[in-house]
C-alpha cells in the first residue's frame, strides 16, 4: 500500500532570481493621467509620478488593492477602485493625496479579486465630461456580465446607464454619446480569442437611444478612448494587442502602435494624452502625433508583501511518513522536508530549499535513508539523504517530465516511480540505473506498490472502455498480468504482507436509486472491498467451518498457537509471493461490508484495514466482522512496523497497529516546524513549475503551435519584478494566455486580502426622494419558499409595498445619509430594524425587522428567467416553453429539472 499520507498538492518554491537595476520600476499597472501627472498601481498601491517620468510617490498604503485610477476632467481629483473597507468599492482622493472618500456602498461580490477571470467589481471607468459623476462597472445583479452606473463624486445613490450590459467606456466631448464595450474579457487568461464573446466597440447615443457597432471585427476590440473626432481602442486583430484609431467623420480605422513582443494593456486617456502598459512599463502618447514614448519611472518601496517571513510548517503539510521503528516522522510542508520526533527530540528541516519544491518524502523500509522528489535542478528528480543526515544524493538525472510519485521496495533496493509521460520506471538505488517498465498510451499507471518480497508490482491502468484494471508486474520477467477483467472498474490494489492476497476496491454493487421526476436511475456507492486469492492453494477466508471441535484437537490448537505466532513474524519478513494466473479472475472474494468508496488498504493476511464511510475501518477475516478504527482519520503503515500513522484534521497521531478501535492519544508536536519563506525565490519556482505543468500536461504536444520555450523566456524576465502574489499570478496568466486555450486559469494561492464586510441588500430597487428619504420603486418578486430567492421585504407579515419609503434603519433616519446602503454595511443576514411609511416622514412610520440579503444576483437571475418564460409563453400563445441552463454542472442540471418537467404541457 502507499506508505505515506497525501493531503494536498502545493506548488511552491523557486529558481534563482534574475538580476535587476535597483531603481528600475516595472509591473506598473492601470495608469491614468491628467496630462501633467501619471497615477498607476504598483504592488497594490497607488503611486504618482510626473508625466515626464522620475521618482514616483506613494499615495495609498493598504492590505487591499487600489487600482484603476481616473483623473477628474479638471485634474484635481482621482477616482479609483479600492478595498479599504473590505469590499471592492469606488473611492476618491485629492490629486495631492490624503484620506480616501468612500463613494459607493454595494454588495460584496465573491468573485471580484484582481486575478478572477471576471475582473474586480466596481471598476472605475471614467468621469462624466462635466466632472460631476463617476462611471463604474458593477456586477451586483449579474455575477458574470456587468452594468454601467454613475454616482456623484461626493457619494450617494448610484444610477444605471440605460444599457443592458457594459464594460470599458468613454464619453464623446459633448457628453451625448458613449463609446463602450459590452463584454469584459480583459482579465481572462485567453489571448487571440475570436469566439462569440469577442468584444466590439459600440457607440450609444443618449439622445437617439441607438447603438452602433464601429468595429465589427472577429478580434478583440476593447477599451475605447474618445478624443475629439477620434476613438482610440485596443485590438489584437494583428495578434499582438495594439492601439488602433477610428475616425468618427471618415469611418476609417488605422493602426497606431506596432508593439510585437508584449500586448498594450489597460490604456486610459485624459485630454489629448493616452497612457498605457506594455511589458510592465508605462508609455504615454499624444493623440495628435500618435507616437508612443516610454516613461522612465523609479520608485522606492518597503515591498512588505515580498519580504521573507517565518511560517508555521504545520499549516502547510502535504505528506507524512512514519519511520520503520515508529520513532520519527518525515513530513513535507510548503516544499520543505522535515525530520521530526514522534515524542521528544529535535525537529530538522533537512532540505532548506526556498527555491525548490520538495515533496513526497518517504523513509526507506530499512530505516537507513529518506527519498523525496525535488525540482532544484529545474526538473523533478529523485533525491536521497541518509536518515542520520549528511549530503543529499541525486538519484535520477536529466529527467524530461514531471514525476508524479514513487514507492520504495520493501528490501529498500529499488524505487518505482511514474511520470507525466505515463511511464512506470524502476530505479536501482545502488547503481542509480533507471529502467522504463512500461508506458501507457491511455494514462498513468496509478497506485503502484510492491509485493512484500519486492519481486512484484501491482497497480491499475485504464482500459479502452475507460474502466481501470488491476495488474501485477513480474520484475524478473519484465511482464505484466491482468488480475481483474474489463467488466468492473477496480482501484487501489495492494498485496497483503503475508503475500496471499491482493486487496482492492471494485465497483460491482448495482443498487440503483430512481429519480422522482421520471423513470431514470443513478448508481452511487458501487464499490466494495475485494480479495484476490493469489495462489490456487489459498482457501477462501469465508469457507464455512464445522463448529464441532474435539477436545484433543482443541488442546493441540492451544499448544501450537504460540509457535504459529512466532513463526508468523518470520514468514512476514520473508513472504514469497506465489501467483497462479490460471483462473485468477475467478478467485475473487468480497468482504461483506456496505458498498461505498474505499481505498488506502493495508492487510497482514488476518485483518484488512481501509478508508471508507468517513473513517478508517478494519475487517477481521477470522472473526468475519468489521470494526471502526478511527472516524475521520486516515491511516498509513510501514512494512514490518508495529506502529501506524493517523492523520485527522490538521493533526498527526502515532499508535500501535490497532486490532479494533484505536486510541489516538495526543497528537505529534508539530509546532517546531518553522519555514523561512523567501518569496522572490518561491515565486520564481512557482512560475517555473507552472510553465512545466503546461509543457508536460497540455493536451497537444505542439502547444497550439506556440514556441513554449520562447514564451517562458518572454515572461520570465518579469518575475523578479513581482512584489505581490497577484503580480506573479498576472505574469503566469499572461504566459498561459499565449496558448489561446479556454479554461486555463491561475490558482490565486496566498493572496493578501482584507476582511470582507458584507453589505445587506433588500432585493429591491430604490430611489432618493427630494425629502432625502429613500423610496421603494420596485420590490423584486421571488419564490416565497426560498430565502435566497425572495426579498426580505416580501416576508409574510412585513407587507412592504412599492411606493413606500424607508425612513430609518436601526434608528438612524435615512435622510441623514447620502446612500441608504451605508447603514446596511455588515448587516447581511443580521436582524435589522427598518421603519416604513407611506409618506416621506418619520411620524406615523411602522417598525419591522428583516434580515437583509447577502447578494441579489440569485434573485435578479430568478426574475430574468421568469420574465423570459412569460415572454416566450405570450409570443407562442402558450405553445413553447423556455428553459435557461446556466452551466453544465449541478446547478445547470437543477435548473433543467426545475423548468423542463413543469412545461411538458407545451
Regions found by a protein language model. Name each.
Residues 720-775, 842-850, 854-862, 866:
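Extended, small/polar residue-biased N-terminal targeting/export presequences
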Residues 786-793, 807, 812-906:
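Cleft-lining beta-strand/loop regions that shape enzyme active-site pockets
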Residues 666-739, 743, 785:
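Terminal targeting/pro-maturation regions of precursor/exported proteins
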Residues 22-49, 316-335, 592-609, 613:
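Beta-strand-rich domains and repeat architectures in extracellular enzymes and scaffolds
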Residues 32-35, 69-77, 125-133, 169-177, ...:
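Blade-terminus and WD-like Trp-Asp/Gly-His loop motifs, strongest in beta-propeller folds
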Residues 22-28, 54-56, 301-317, 577-594:
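A short helix->beta-strand "capping" segment at the edge of beta-propeller domains
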Amino acid at each position: 500500500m502507499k506508505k505515506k499520507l497525501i493531503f494536498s498538492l502545493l506548488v511552491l518554491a523557486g529558481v534563482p532570481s534574475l538580476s535587476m537595476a535597483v531603481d528600475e520600476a516595472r509591473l506598473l499597472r492601470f495608469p491614468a493621467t491628467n496630462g501633467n501627472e501619471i497615477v498607476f498601481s504598483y504592488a497594490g498601491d497607488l503611486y504618482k509620478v510626473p508625466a515626464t517620468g522620475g521618482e514616483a510617490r506613494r499615495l495609498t498604503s493598504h492590505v487591499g488593492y487600489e487600482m484603476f485610477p481616473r483623473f477628474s476632467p479638471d485634474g484635481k481629483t482621482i477616482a479609483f477602485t479600492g478595498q479599504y473597507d473590505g469590499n471592492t468599492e469606488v473611492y476618491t482622493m485629492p490629486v495631492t493625496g490624503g484620506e480616501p472618500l468612500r463613494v459607493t456602498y454595494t454588495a460584496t461580490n465573491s468573485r471580484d479579486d484582481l486575478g478572477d477571470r471576471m475582473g474586480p467589481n466596481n471598476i472605475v471607468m471614467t468621469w462624466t465630461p462635466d466632472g460631476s459623476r463617476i462611471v463604474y462597472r458593477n456586477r451586483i445583479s449579474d455575477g458574470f456580465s456587468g452594468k454601467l452606473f454613475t454616482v456623484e463624486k461626493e457619494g450617494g445613490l448610484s444610477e444605471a446607464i440605460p444599457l443592458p450590459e457594459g464594460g470599458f467606456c468613454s464619453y464623446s466631448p459633448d457628453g451625448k454619446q458613449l463609446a463602450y464595450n459590452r463584454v469584459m474579457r480583459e482579465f481572462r487568461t485567453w489571448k487571440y480569442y475570436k469566439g462569440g464573446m469577442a468584444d466590439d466597440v459600440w457607440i450609444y447615443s443618449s439622445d437617439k437611444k441607438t447603438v452602433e457597432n464601429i468595429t465589427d471585427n472577429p478580434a478583440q476590440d476593447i477599451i475605447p478612448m474618445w478624443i475629439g473626432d477620434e476613438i482610440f481602442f485596443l485590438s489584437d486583430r494583428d495578434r499582438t494587442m495594439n492601439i488602433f484609431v477610428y475616425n468618427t467623420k471618415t469611418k476609417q480605422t488605422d493602426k497606431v502602435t506596432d508593439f510585437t513582443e508584449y500586448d498594450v494593456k489597460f490604456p486610459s486617456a485624459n485630454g489629448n494624452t493616452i497612457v498605457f502598459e506594455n511589458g510592465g512599463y508605462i508609455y504615454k502618447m499624444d493623440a495628435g502625433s500618435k507616437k508612443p514614448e516610454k516613461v522612465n519611472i523609479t520608485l522606492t518601496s518597503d515591498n512588505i508583501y515580498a519580504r521573507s517571513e517565518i511560517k508555521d510548517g504545520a499549516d502547510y503539510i502535504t505528506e507524512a511518513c512514519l519511520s520503520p521503528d515508529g520513532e520519527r516522522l518525515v513530513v513535507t510542508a510548503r516544499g520543505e522536508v522535515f525530520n521530526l520526533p514522534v515524542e521528544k527530540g529535535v525537529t530538522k528541516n533537512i532540505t532548506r530549499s526556498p527555491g525548490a519544491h520538495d515533496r513526497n518524502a518517504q523513509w526507506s523500509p530499512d530505516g537507513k535513508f529518506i527519498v523525496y522528489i525535488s525540482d532544484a535542478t529545474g526538473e523533478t528528480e529523485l533525491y536521497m539523504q541518509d536518515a542520520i543526515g549528511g549530503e543529499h544524493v541525486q538519484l535520477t538525472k536529466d529527467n524530461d517530465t514531471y514525476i508524479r510519485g514513487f514507492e520504495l521496495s520493501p528490501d529498500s533496493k529499488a524505487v518505482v516511480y511514474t511520470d507525466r509521460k505515463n511511464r512506470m520506471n524502476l530505479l536501482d538505488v545502488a547503481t542509480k540505473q533507471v529502467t522504463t517498465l512500461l508506458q501507457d498510451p491511455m494514462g498513468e499507471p496509478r497506485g503502484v506498490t510492491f509485493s512484500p518480497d519486492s519481486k512484484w508490482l501491482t497497480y491499475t491502468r485504464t482500459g479502452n472502455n475507460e474502466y481501470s484494471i488491476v495488474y501485477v508486474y513480474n520484475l524478473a520477467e519484465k511482464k505484466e498480468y491482468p488480475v481483474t477483467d474489463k467488466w468492473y472498474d477496480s482501484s487501489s490494489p495492494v498485496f497483503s504482507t503475508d503475500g496471499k492476497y491482493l486487496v482492492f476496491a471494485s465497483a460491482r454493487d448495482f443498487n440503483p436509486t430512481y429519480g422522482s421526476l421520471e423513470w431514470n436511475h443513478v448508481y452511487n456507492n458501487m464499490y466494495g472491498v475485494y480479495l484476490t486469492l493469489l495462489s490456487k492453494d489459498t482457501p477462501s477466508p469465508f469457507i464455512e467451518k464445522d463448529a464441532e471441535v474435539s477436545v484433543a484437537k482443541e488442546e493441540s490448537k492451544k499448544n501450537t498457537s504460540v509457535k504459529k505466532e512466532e513463526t508468523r513474524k518470520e514468514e512476514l519478513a520473508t513472504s514469497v509471493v506465489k501467483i497462479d494466473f490460471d483462473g485468477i479472475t475467478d478467485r475473487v472474494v468480497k468482504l461483506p461490508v456496505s458498498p461505498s468508496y474505499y481505498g488506502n488498504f493495508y492487510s497482514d493476511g488476518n485483518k484488512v484495514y481501509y478508508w471508507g464511510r468517513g473513517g478508517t475501518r478494519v475487517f477481521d477475516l477470522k472473526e468475519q466482522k468489521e470494526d471502526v478504527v478511527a472516524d475521520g482519520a486516515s491511516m498509513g503503515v510501514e512494512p514490518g512496523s508495529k506502529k501506524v500513522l493517523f492523520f485527522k484534521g490538521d493533526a498527526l497521531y502515532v499508535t500501535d497497529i490497532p486490532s479494533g478501535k484505536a486510541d489516538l492519544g495526543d497528537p505529534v508536536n508539530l509546532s517546531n516546524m518553522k519555514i523561512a519563506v523567501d518569496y522572490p525565490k518561491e515565486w520564481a519556482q512557482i512560475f517555473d513549475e507552472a510553465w512545466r505543468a503546461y509543457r508536460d500536461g497540455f493536451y497537444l504536444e505542439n502547444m497550439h503551435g506556440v514556441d513554449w520555450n520562447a514564451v517562458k523566456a518572454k515572461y520570465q524576465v518579469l518575475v523578479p519584478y513581482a512584489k505581490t502574489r497577484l503580480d506573479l499570478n498576472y505574469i503566469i496568466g499572461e504566459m498561459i494566455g499565449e496558448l489561446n486555450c479556454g479554461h486555463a486559469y491561475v490558482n490565486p494561492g496566498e493572496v493578501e486580502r482584507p476582511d470582507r464586510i458584507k453589505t445587506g441588500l433588500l432585493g429591491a430597487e430604490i430611489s432618493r426622494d427630494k425629502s432625502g428619504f429613500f423610496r421603494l420603486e420596485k420590490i423584486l418578486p421571488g419564490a416565497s419558499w426560498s430565502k435566497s430567492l425572495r426579498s426580505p421585504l416580501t416576508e409574510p407579515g412585513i407587507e412592504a409595498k412599492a411606493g413606500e419609503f424607508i425612513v430609518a434603519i436601526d434608528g438612524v433616519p435615512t435622510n441623514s445619509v447620502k446612500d441608504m446602503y451605508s447603514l446596511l454595511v455588515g448587516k447581511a443576514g443580521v436582524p435589522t430594524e427598518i421603519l416604513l411609511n407611506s409618506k416621506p416622514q418619520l411620524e406615523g412610520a411602522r417598525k419591522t425587522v428583516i434580515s437583509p440579503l447577502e447578494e441579489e444576483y440569485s434573485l435578479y437571475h430568478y426574475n430574468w428567467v421568469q420574465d423570459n418564460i412569460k415572454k416566450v409563453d405570450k409570443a407562442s400563445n402558450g405553445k413553447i416553453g423556455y428553459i435557461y441552463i446556466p452551466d453544465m454542472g449541478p446547478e445547470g442540471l437543477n435548473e433543467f429539472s426545475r423548468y423542463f418537467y413543469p412545461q411538458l404541457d407545451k
